[in-house]
Swiss-Prot record:
<dbReference type="Pfam" id="PF01243">
    <property type="entry name" value="PNPOx_N"/>
</dbReference>
<feature type="binding site">
    <location>
        <begin position="77"/>
        <end position="78"/>
    </location>
    <ligand>
        <name>FMN</name>
    </ligand>
</feature>
<feature type="binding site">
    <location>
        <position position="186"/>
    </location>
    <ligand>
        <name>FMN</name>
    </ligand>
</feature>
<feature type="binding site">
    <location>
        <position position="196"/>
    </location>
    <ligand>
        <name>FMN</name>
    </ligand>
</feature>
<feature type="binding site">
    <location>
        <position position="128"/>
    </location>
    <ligand>
        <name>substrate</name>
    </ligand>
</feature>
<feature type="binding site">
    <location>
        <begin position="9"/>
        <end position="12"/>
    </location>
    <ligand>
        <name>substrate</name>
    </ligand>
</feature>
<comment type="similarity">
    <text>Belongs to the pyridoxamine 5'-phosphate oxidase family.</text>
</comment>
<keyword id="KW-0288">FMN</keyword>
<keyword id="KW-0560">Oxidoreductase</keyword>
<keyword id="KW-0285">Flavoprotein</keyword>
<comment type="function">
    <text>Catalyzes the oxidation of either pyridoxine 5'-phosphate (PNP) or pyridoxamine 5'-phosphate (PMP) into pyridoxal 5'-phosphate (PLP).</text>
</comment>
<protein>
    <recommendedName>
        <fullName>Pyridoxine/pyridoxamine 5'-phosphate oxidase</fullName>
        <ecNumber>1.4.3.5</ecNumber>
    </recommendedName>
</protein>
<feature type="binding site">
    <location>
        <begin position="141"/>
        <end position="142"/>
    </location>
    <ligand>
        <name>FMN</name>
    </ligand>
</feature>
<feature type="binding site">
    <location>
        <position position="84"/>
    </location>
    <ligand>
        <name>FMN</name>
    </ligand>
</feature>
<keyword id="KW-0664">Pyridoxine biosynthesis</keyword>
<comment type="subunit">
    <text>Homodimer.</text>
</comment>
<dbReference type="InterPro" id="IPR019740">
    <property type="entry name" value="Pyridox_Oxase_CS"/>
</dbReference>
Length: 214
């Protein structure tokens, strides 16, 4: 291993996390942390790793953007025919990870996904920049394409098709809601003795809260 890589390390000293601080509702506590990250001007504060599993059990992950919290679920939008979309169709279990280094914090959310209603997807779709709406139509996401000109040609085709018209929400595009069953809040501490507070749903659908070792 390159010694320069192995020597990279940082001591975390900004804050602490007591179990009492997390309250009784992990979604509300997430919103509190998220707002603090926004106020701290974290770059791409809503960026999160979305981990999925392929049909043959291989892990897969990518960065997507959180686009809302609705009825205790975390929302993101994508092409349903993309690689992630096909994986979610066969296995709805996912994990989300937020990392906010400016605050020395991480949040892990385990749960399962369901598609949101077409009405919810349509409302968000039409809130996007027009170019992004056309891009969703033009891009056969995760499919092989011959070159970039192919993509640019499709973009121009749909730009012309929808000139002076509202862009239709594609049938293959929409939102997912992640319903959590476990949420972990991680606060960096000195000596690698980090604070880790976990909320886990029990059989009664209420939350159990406990501390785990770093």
């Amino acid at each position: 291993m390159d010694p320069k890589i192995s020597e990279i390390r940082k001591s975390y000293t900004l804050s602490s996390l007591e179990i009492e601080d997390a309250g009784s509702d992990p979604v509300l506590f997430f919103q509190k942390w998220f707002e603090e990250a926004v106020q701290s001007e974290v770059l791409e504060v809503n960026a999160m790793t979305l981990a999925t599993v392929t049909q043959d059990g291989k892990p897969d992950a990518r960065i997507v953007l959180l686009k809302g919290i609705l009825k205790e679920s975390f929302l993101f939008y994508t092409n349903y025919e993309s690689r992630k979309g096909t994986e979610l169709e066969t296995n709805p279990n996912v994990c989300l990870v937020f990392f906010w280094p400016e605050l020395e914090r991480q949040v892990r959310i385990e749960g399962n996904v369901t598609k949101v209603s077409r009405e919810v997807s349509k409302e968000y779709f039409h809130s996007r920049p027009r170019e992004s709406q056309i891009g969703a139509l033009a891009s056969p996401q995760s499919q092989k394409i011959p070159d970039r000109k192919f993509l640019e040609g499709r973009f121009q085709k749909f730009t012309n098709q929808y000139q002076n018209k509202e862009v239709d929400l594609p049938n293959h595009w929409g939102g997912y809601a992640v319903y959590p069953c476990r949420i972990e809040f991680w606060q960096g501490r000195s000596s690698r003795l980090h604070d880790r507070i976990v909320f886990e749903r029990d059989t009664s659908s209420s939350w159990e809260k406990f501390r785990i070792a770093p």
